[in-house]
Structure formats: structure tokens, C-alpha cells
């Protein structure tokens, strides 16, 4: 493996995280009070989680991220619409989310869905006057921003491989 090949993935991840952070920060900043730094953070985390060694692995990771984030955002939004934040309630929402993922035969999405529950519930608790539904939607969109940046970045990056058997 050449030095360029060894540096490609770290560079892809760093650039994707930066671009996703900036876009997420800007986007969430359009909604006063909804914490643009959290929007940037969540977008960057998504880009890091989704970026993989190959295009195929990145695409697969992207589908996990989007569906998992949607399930987690919906579960936490429903909980926070009915009840205020509480750590035990968060654990209950995580349990329900993982159970739902398992019940609909997508257990591989459960971890990312559970992480989304935590992020939505904790950020929502920072200012309970804000709309919990909008907070959950923003966290989902930020996840999509990071995911999109990662997929686009891997597809456009020179030397990115389609799969692990590629030599290009």
C-alpha cells in the first residue's frame, strides 16, 4: 500500500467531517434557538460514521445511518411530545427503539437508532420550550447532511475504490 493510499481514508474522513460540520452549522442556524453547533456536530459525526474504505461499504453504511436516524428521531419525538426528558425515560425510549428495529427485522440499524434517541432527547432537554418535533426533525436532517456529504465525498475522491477488490 502506497503512502497516498494510506492517507486517502483519513483525508476523506477529515474533509467530510469539516464540510458536513459547516453545512450542518449553517442549516441549523436557520432555526433560531436550535443550537447550530449541535447541528454541525451531528452532521460531522454522521459523515465520520458513514465514510468507509470503499464506495460500496459507504453506501451500505449510509442506508443504516438514514433508517436508524429516522427510527430514533421518531421514537424520541413521540416520547418527548408526551413526557419531559428524564434519563430513565431516555433508557425506555432506547429500549423501545432497539425493540422496534428488531421487530421489523433490521437489528443492524438499532445502534444508530439508539444513538439518535440520545442526541435528540439530550439536545431537546437543553431548552424544553423548543418544539421537540422540530428538534427531532433537525437532528434527522443533520444526519442526512453528514450522510450525503460522506457518500458524495467518497464517490468524488480521486482513488476511491468501488469495493475492496478494486485496484484503482
Where are each of the predicted segments found?
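Alpha-helical transmembrane segments and their membrane-interface boundaries
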Residues: 1-117, 122-168
Amino acid at each position: 500500500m502506497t503512502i497516498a493510499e494510506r492517507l486517502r481514508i483519513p483525508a476523506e474522513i477529515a474533509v467530510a467531517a469539516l464540510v458536513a460540520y459547516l453545512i450542518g452549522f449553517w442549516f441549523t442556524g436557520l432555526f433560531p434557538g436550535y443550537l447550530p453547533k449541535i447541528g454541525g456536530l451531528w452532521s460531522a459525526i454522521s459523515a465520520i460514521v458513514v465514510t468507509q474504505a470503499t464506495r460500496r461499504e459507504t453506501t451500505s453504511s449510509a442506508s443504516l445511518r438514514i433508517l436508524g436516524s429516522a427510527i430514533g428521531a421518531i421514537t424520541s419525538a413521540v416520547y418527548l411530545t408526551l413526557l419531559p426528558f428524564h434519563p430513565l425515560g431516555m433508557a425506555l425510549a432506547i429500549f423501545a427503539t432497539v425493540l422496534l428495529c428488531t421487530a421489523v427485522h433490521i437489528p443492524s440499524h438499532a445502534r444508530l437508532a439508539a444513538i439518535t434517541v440520545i442526541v435528540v432527547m439530550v439536545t431537546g432537554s437543553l431548552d424544553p420550550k423548543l418544539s421537540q418535533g422540530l428538534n427531532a426533525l433537525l437532528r434527522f436532517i443533520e444526519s442526512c447532511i453528514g450522510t450525503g456529504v460522506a457518500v458524495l465525498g467518497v464517490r468524488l475522491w480521486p482513488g476511491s475504490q468501488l469495493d475492496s477488490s478494486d485496484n484503482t
